[in-house]
Structures are given as C-alpha cells and as structure tokens.
Amino acid sequence: MYKRQVIGHKNPDTDSICSAIAYANLKNKITGEKYIAKRAGEVNGETAYVLDKFQVSVPSLLDNVHLQVKDMDIRHIEGVSGHMSIKDAWARMKDENIKTLPVTRGEKLEGLITIGDIATSYMEVYDNNILATARTQYRNIVKTLDGTLISGNEHGYFLNGKVVIAASSPDLMENFIEKDDLVILGNRYESQLCAIEMDASCLVICQGANISKTIKKMAEERDIVIIQTPHDTFTAARLINQSIPVKYFMSRDNLEIFHLNDYVEHVKEVMSKTKYRDFPILDNKGKFCGFLSRRRLMTSRKKQVILVDHNEKKQSISDIETANIVEIVDHHRICLLYTSPSPRDRTRS
C-alpha cells in the first residue's frame, strides 16, 4: 500500500508534532489508506514529556522528501529454498507469470534463479555427472519423475556416480555401470540384479514395472534407493535433470541489489547501465523484501506529503519542492508554496 507522509515544520514544537500524529491517525481511519506521521527535527523536552505521558510513540525523523525505494511499488514474491527442483521452480514461475525467483534462507537472499538459468540447465545434457555434482536430493528425483520410493531414504542425496541407461544385456552393463551410479532401466530382473551387484546407489524402474521381493530385499540390505516411475525410459532420462536443485544454477555473485532507503535517482542511474529487468530489494537488516522492476520505476511518482502547522517553504523539510503536497492544514497565514497538483488547503485562525 502506498504511504503518505504527514509532517510539521522544522524545529518542531508540541503543536507541530501532535498535529502530525493526530491528522495521520484521522486520515488512516476515514480513508482506509496509509498515512504516517513524521517529524522534521528533534523533539524538545515539553513534547517528549507529553508523548510519554500519553504513551504515544515519537514520529520517526524525515531528513528530506526525495523519492526512495520504499516509496515505490515493490512486488513481493515469496522466496524459495535452494533445494527446490528446477522443475518446481519453472512451474512456480509459470503459475505466477514471473521470470525471476528469489532463493532465500531464513528471509536472507542467497541468489536468483531466472528463466535463462533454467534454459541453461536444459542444455547441460552431455554431463551425466551433473546430478551428483549438484548434490541432488532423492526426494526431488521422486517428485520430478512422478515416482514412488520403493526403498532407501528420500532425504538422502545423490553425491557420487553418473546417470546411465541400462538398455543392454547384463554382460554389457558390467562394462559401463560403476559403483554409486544411478541406473535407469526397465522390468528385466537380470538387469536390476546386475545394477545392484555393481553397487549402484539408485535404480529408477520405468513404466511402473513390478519389483520383486528379492530385488527389494537386496536393495534394502545395501542401502540402495529404488524409485518406480510410470514414465518410459526415454521420458525419465529427459526429466531427471529437472530434479537438480535451483542453488546449482542460480546466480549468486555480482547481483545488483538495492535497499529500501536508497534514493530513486541513484537507482535509475544504476539500472540504466544494466540489462536486468528485476532488482532485489533488501531492508536495513538484509531481509529480502521483493523486486523492483524497470517498468515500475519508470512509472514512479513523487512522494506525497501533507503539511501541518505551517505552509512556508522556509519552514518546511528540505527539498519540499520535489514532493507532491496533497494537503496543507494550518492556522497561520497562507503563503505561496507551489506544487503539482495543487494542494488542498485548510487554514483556521
């Protein structure tokens, strides 16, 4: 929700501070929008006493009214775990019509995964060790293959070995299957037995083929994972790389990051020199807040403020001419304080 600032004059007295607090509270109640009381200087002893007496918080200090990132329309997108599969990340992007996902851990940004990164993952088809290199969790493999875990620990990780397809006889399989490999195969008992005897770490049984009690028992004794999938061998081989965790392909270095208190003028300058569409925004504690896009930045509007207890530029916060003054509420004389659009004025003697 867009926030409007309600602020009194410099060197504020009790009248100025309390007017800002009261009017912001009134506007919040009658409009349903967000108005925040601010101050343009330090509070004096009298004001501090009054606020403490009535248990009212002191408004935060506002140095100027230049537009900041926190004034922009930041798009909040829930972060994903680095363990999420490429397939699930793609589905999330498609459902939410977004091109970038934040990868977070405890609300801290770890990296970004983009559609371009996912496209790159599809091109890594010649590296049959990539599942192990990426430390892929068996749970991801089960889900990606629409499979069922028959034996083994789904929370374990495929850490060593390569991915192979056992499309030949057991005699030939012995020549290319090595210890800790992940083997994709069909319903042939002899092939399944050979893969176990070669000490594979995982068997992917395709087309929902039955798995004998003997094979299952041998796998359990050797702590070998067996996954049953309804897909054929070709489809399983195509899908399996989509189980790789996003942290393997995400961008984590040289990210262009902005903070809530950054000024928009600076942000525009930086954005003009980069090719990215979406930029992650962090708060002052490093918590991920959302994305600011080029398009949203181009449609930015000035900070909207309401002046109370004054209406002269020399009394106002610095650079007041850079803001849109939407209202002036004062009991003094009216002075010429230009803004666009013209403010609504209330003056009472």
Residues covered by each model-derived region:
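Bateman/CBS regulatory modules and CBS-like beta-alpha motifs in cytosolic regions of diverse proteins
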Residues: 5, 60-92, 104, 138-189, ...
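Short hydrophobic alpha-helical runs that function as membrane-insertion/retention elements
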Residues: 36, 59-61, 101-102, 182-185, ...
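Active-site cofactor/cluster-binding pocket
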Residues: 56-58, 63, 302-337
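Short, ordered loop/turn segments at secondary-structure junctions
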Residues: 10-11, 40-42, 106, 115-118, ...
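Short beta->alpha transition motifs characteristic of CBS
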Residues: 98, 102, 109-125, 231, ...
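Conserved small/polar residues in nucleotide/adenosyl-binding loops
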Residues: 1-5, 338-348
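N-terminal beta-loop-helix "entrance" segment that forms/cooperates
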Residues: 37-56
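Histidine-anchored nucleotide/phosphate-binding helix
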Residues: 19-27
